[in-house]
Amino acid sequence: MGRVILSGASKGMTKPTVGAPISELAVGSPVRLSVNGTVTDFLIVNQGIPSNSILYDSSCNGTWLLMKNIYENRVWQSGNINKYESSDIHTYLNNTFLNLFESNIRDAIKQVKLPYRKNGGSGGSDQSGANGLLCKIFLLSGYEIG
């Protein structure tokens, strides 16, 4: 579905039996969180700011989680517009979907500045670092997929 970046452990967060804070878990470690009352599997895909990348600013310094399975299929945009910043999916992820997490988890998810193409398509301009798009949950881009 997308990524969330958590800032350390939060009271009530699901922890492994050893009780390590999420910030100390290795990349590839599984994490289980409740989404809309259902235990859902995530994987830790990064710790800190992605290495060797100037695309991300300090807001992205945290534990990056990827939902292991597709939660649901949603439309990108109901109109014929290719702008992620005003897309239906961006709005859904950072409002409706975000609110499916318990409040303590929602509070632990960091707001980050995500690299994106402002105004989309060939007429847009790449934005990154401090000029990134503010969000808490986002779809993977081609860059993040690798």
Where are these regions (language model features)?
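Collagenous Gly-X-Y triple-helix signature in extracellular proteins
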Residues: 2-6, 13-146
